[in-house]
Amino acid sequence: MHARLAASSLVLVVLCVGCGQSGPPTSPTSSAAITSTSSDAPGGSIAIPFKGRLEGEADPPVFEPPPSPFFSAHLVASGNATLLGRFTLDFSHRVNLNTLVGIGDAALTAANGDALLTHVEGQAMPAGSPTAFTVVETHTVTGGTGRFEGASGSFVVTRAVDFANPFTSGSIEGSIFAPSGKF
């Protein structure tokens, strides 16, 4: 009992210290630091916190012919996140100008080529100037490649974008479920 309590305390200290750093993570989370199984996790999967930051640039939107309220958008970003380390994001989506809702698909690819694949639903909200918006996107993990094969879970990307300047940056927070023995 004492050994189990000591091991649990050590894991808690390691997680608190790791999550308390002021900058973004610099390497993927080690599976050795993960010891608990979530009751919300599918079929014996392990829930792993997923946090990070990204920044990138959007391509100019492609508007559909009137009277359609839709345009297509493409974003390429890079960042740093737990599990992935340094990554690139490739995100294509379609936005309704009437509702400011966007739907699309994204791939977050780690430096070694392993990727998390997601379906994305987002909502833009005006943020000051007529061209500035805060975008909140829910990424639902639909699978992956390499070590992320069979992954599930979801995370939220909250980012700022100004269409007068295609630069965007933001944060990532959620949980990824790893099939037993993965990550």
Positions of PLM-derived features:
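Bacterial N-terminal signal peptides that target proteins for export
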Residues: 1-9
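C-terminal motif of bacterial Sec signal peptides marking the signal peptidase cleavage site
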Residues: 15-18
